[in-house]
């Protein structure tokens, strides 16, 4: 696995890369402390399946620069800019949590550049349960009002991981590093900007979960059975509403699917993206 930096739209961006073959971009979520580091335990397994795997720190996360625009819309456009910078005309996308929305939107609007999508634990791509309202307003943006301590970071990870033994001292140190300083400032700015994004989303004629059938690229969704927001119940509802939807539930697995179910994730994603797209 190589760690590199590249300039994209005037921002210095860190990324990891491993393997050769069809290109796959791994897009991390938006909770405090998220970065490309959430994928480092998965790159080798995916690369071994004949894929060129790239995971980058999105703007405002990890070791990448903070942009002026911290909106989800900007980070969606930035995926294409990053692809251009690393000279990828096409790339399969794996989006975790909030970034599953990014991946699906790009497949809808730029399908010629996105020949396949895997969604991990994106609650907003599941229908709400009747009478429960909308549960994903701040999807994947969990954090803290004050810069977190090591114990704050541990608690946040424990909410998202079924197997607590995965939260090693090294993992905690990295997560805390990615949760403080310029990344915490970016988190606060994203929180303040969220109101404007809600107004914009209300203008859309249909939520993305109702548009999954419009995605022309091969699409697979993977959720942890023990994830928050009644994910298992809503996944079952999604499969009833969308006939033929390629959706998988993994047991003993919470929100960080790529950690709790690393082998299942690699098998389900690697074979799907290498063979069917």
Kindly give the residue locations of the regions a language model identified.
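Gly/Ala-rich beta-loop-alpha elbow adjacent to hydrolase catalytic centers
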Residues: 95, 99, 103
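Flexible "cap/lid" loop of the alpha/beta hydrolase fold
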Residues: 104, 108, 115-155
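Acidic catalytic loop of the alpha/beta-hydrolase fold
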Residues: 226-230
């Amino acid at each position: 696995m190589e760690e590199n930096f590249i300039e994209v739209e005037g921002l210095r961006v860190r990324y990891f890369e491993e393997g050769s073959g069809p290109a796959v971009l791994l897009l991390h979520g938006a909770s405090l402390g998220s970065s490309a580091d959430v994928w480092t335990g998965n790159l080798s397994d995916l690369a071994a399946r004949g894929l060129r795997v790239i995971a980058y720190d999105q703007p405002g996360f990890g070791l990448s620069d903070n942009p002026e625009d911290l909106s989800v819309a900007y980070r969606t456009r930035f995926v294409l800019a990053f692809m251009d910078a690393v000279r990828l005309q096409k790339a399969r996308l794996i989006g975790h949590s909030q970034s599953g929305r990014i991946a699906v939107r790009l497949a809808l609007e730029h399908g010629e550049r996105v020949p396949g999508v895997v969604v991990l634990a994106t609650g907003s791509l599941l229908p709400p349960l009747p009478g429960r309202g909308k549960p994903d307003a701040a999807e994947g943006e969990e954090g803290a009002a004050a810069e977190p301590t090591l114990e704050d970071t541990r608690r946040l990870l424990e909410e998202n991981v079924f197997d607590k033994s995965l939260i090693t001292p090294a993992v905690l140190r990295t997560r805390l590093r990615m949760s403080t300083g310029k990344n915490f400032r970016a988190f606060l700015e994203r929180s303040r900007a969220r109101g404007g994004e809600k107004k914009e989303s209300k203008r859309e004629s249909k939520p993305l979960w109702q548009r999954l059938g419009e995605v022309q690229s091969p699409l697979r969704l993977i959720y942890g059975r023990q994830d928050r927001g009644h994910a298992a119940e809503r996944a079952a509802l999604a499969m009833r509403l969308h006939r033929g939807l390629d959706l998988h539930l993994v047991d003993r697995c919470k929100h960080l699917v790529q950690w709790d179910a690393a082998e299942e994730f690699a098998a389900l994603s690697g074979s799907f993206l290498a063979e069917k797209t």
